[in-house]
From Swiss-Prot:
NCBIfam families: PRK00197.1, proA. The keyword Ribosomal protein does not apply. PROSITE patterns: PROA (PS01223). It comes from Prochlorococcus marinus (strain NATL2A). InterPro entries: Ald_DH/histidinol_DH, Ald_DH_C, Ald_DH_N, Aldehyde_DH_dom, G-glutamylP_reductase_CS, Glu-5-SA_DH, GPR_dom. This is Gamma-glutamyl phosphate reductase. GO terms for biological process: L-proline biosynthetic process. Belongs to the gamma-glutamyl phosphate reductase family.
Length: 438
């Protein structure tokens, strides 16, 4: 997408939808924990009741998108199987079982007798979510929005339009049955609406883009609303020389082939030169049998990798069964390569040397840095967050998989009894600053 583009003003109809979402979000944010949990239960029930219609709509989307030439990785993300849908429904129920993120007192302090300060978590307000291909993302984000007391304007890709509409109909049915948050969730359906969303800074508190690098960059450059997200998912796995070869191959395979279209799948494998020959001799046939195309540097080509990796491959997110391989001298060279090419999403090291592992963990500045495990664990559900609205690679929090805690902010409450600053400025009164129990 070109950035030399003037984002149009939102239409009156879109402004009206945003106003309704804002009003509904205030009501939802003031609802009780029990009410929001009941709403999620009804949303899950409605999804389950309408599962056949949702899956039928998904087949229609898949058939149309395949005819239109949608690429393989996006088709993979678009597909919603019966098993995946059931997992999404279970995820909604698990979100309802998570601790209430609203109303948590983070600070409780006496400033002076009868002058008490509190810092308490509150909902953000309205989320603007733009996502491509994955209809399951709609379910995840909607459930987290409701649980955290936020409204949401959601725009999915046109390739998933029938699936998304069937899902939204079910979610809305659940909210109406629970009699809480009706109108808090709205599905945007046109490109004009998604562009207009970027100008709704009076109503939308956070934009969460989930899609291509181009999509994320375009949004970041064309809105005044805070943006949570990441562009590319260029993840690395480094195999050290102090390693169990079988363990390393197993972790590398899982990090690549378990779901290659995921943003937490590795795109580059770095191998210590001391064990490169042994690793590739055993690993190449296994990767080949799994249909993985390997592209290597000069050293790895000399050890059997058939395809050449050029400079652009080190910064490429394949989202497919393609893996770049580079042989490095040591952990320091691996770290330098990662610093140069990483998108700061997730990196991992396989080593039995704890000192080398700690060096890697403390030196790599990514949202997730792992030791002896697959990069595919970078996921809100696997972290125990219930689900995630997205993954943030920014340095400021929230960072990494963002669940409920990333969808609330805080507010300061100060309760007094006629207290005046002039009394403290004159010295007649003084601050006690005593921390009280939370």
């Amino acid at each position: 997408m070109s950035t030399n583009f003037s984002v149009p003003e939102p239409t009156p109809q879109l402004v009206k939808v945003a106003e309704s979402a804002k009003e509904a979000s205030i009501s939802l944010g003031q609802s009780t924990n029990k009410q929001r949990c009941e709403a999620l239960t009804e949303m899950a029930n409605a999804l389950n009741d309408n599962a056949d219609e949702i899956l039928k709509a998904n087949v229609q989307d898949l058939e149309r998108s395949e005819k239109e030439g949608l690429n393989k990785s996006l088709l993979s993300r678009l597909q919603l199987t019966k098993t995946k849908l059931k997992g999404c429904i279970d995820g909604v129920l698990k979100v309802s079982n998570l601790a209430d993120p609203i109303g948590k007192r983070q600070l409780h302090r006496e400033l002076n007798e009868n002058l008490i300060l509190e810092r308490v978590t509150v909902p953000l307000g309205v989320l603007g979510v733009i996502f491509e291909s994955r209809p399951d993302a709609l379910i995840q984000i909607a459930s987290l929005a409701v649980r955290s007391g936020n409204g949401a304007l959601l725009k999915g890709g046109s390739e998933a339009k029938d699936t998304n509409q069937a899902i939204m109909d079910s979610l809305d049915k659940g909210l109406r049955k629970a009699n809480v948050g009706s109108g808090a969730l709205s599905l945007l359906t046109t490109r004009q609406e998604s562009l207009g969303l970027l100008r709704l800074d009076k109503f939308v508190n956070l934009i969460i883009p989930r899609g291509s690098n181009e999509l994320v960059q375009f949004i970041q450059e064309n809105t005044r609303i805070p943006v949570l997200g990441h562009a590319d998912g260029i993840c690395h796995l480094y195999v050290d020389n102090s390693v169990d070869i079988d363990k390393a191959i197993s972790i590398a395979l899982d990090s690549k082939i378990q779901y290659p279209a995921a943003c937490n799948a590795i795109e580059t494998l770095l191998i210590h030169e001391d064990i490169a020959e042994m690793f590739l001799k055993k690993g190449l046939p296994i990767f080949s049998s799994e249909g993985v195309t390997l592209k290597g540097d000069t050293k790895s080509q000399a050890l059997g990798v058939k395809n050449k990796a050029d400079e652009s491959d080190w910064s490429k997110e394949y989202l497919d069964l393609i893996l770049s391989i580079k042989i490095v001298r040591n952990v320091n060279e691996a770290i330098e390569h990662i610093r140069k090419y990483s998108s700061r999403h997730t990196e991992a090291i396989v080593t039995e040397d704890k000192m080398v592992a700690e060096k890697f963990l403390s030196s790599v500045d990514s949202a997730g840095v792992y030791h002896n495990c697959s990069t595919r664990f970078a996921d809100g559900f696997r972290y125990g967050f219930g689900a995630e609205v997205g993954i943030s690679t920014q340095t400021l929090p929230p960072r990494g998989p963002v669940g409920l805690e990333g969808l609330v902010t805080y507010r300061y409450y100060l309760r007094g009894d006629g207290d005046l600053v002039k009394d403290f400025a004159s010295g007649d009164r003084s601050f006690s600053h005593i921390d009280l129990p939370l």
